């Protein structure tokens, strides 16, 4: 759970600027909901109808992230961009052709979001659809880690829920491949010590005297 929490926090941090740009709303905020672990079948039941789902693979068919959002909420964001109030019919379960381009832009932002949060460029959308069970490669009894992020544009009365689900194998892959950047030595350069960034930093200095008996004949 700790590893997934860390990953989700990175997603939330990266989501704000990306979604703010997508929605043309600098005041947009992103909040992270509670984290849960449940069988994939239970998660699918919670998604309900009228969703837009995308599976973002991690270079392998069964490893990746399932990202879901409501068609109605997606259309509401698009309507706000056009200057509307963001109010849509409750039975808006099918993506209108006018919002198809916006949906593709959303998918591109999610792919970028996953890449940045995981530092894995392999993340890419491999399947999309209105029915999650048709594109999700997890078995119904597979455990998945889930979280809901809520994006709320400035001035909006309601938020936009974006749901993430990852299987344990995907999480293990992300954790196992996490690269630890080695320390990189940098030379001071032609400016010398006084002209370097540490030239005027006071550093503690300690000298240790060591008694080393040595014959005078050995000293040149």
Question: What is each of the regions a protein language model found here?
Answer:
Residues 1-220:
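N-terminal auxiliary interaction/assembly segments of multi-subunit proteins
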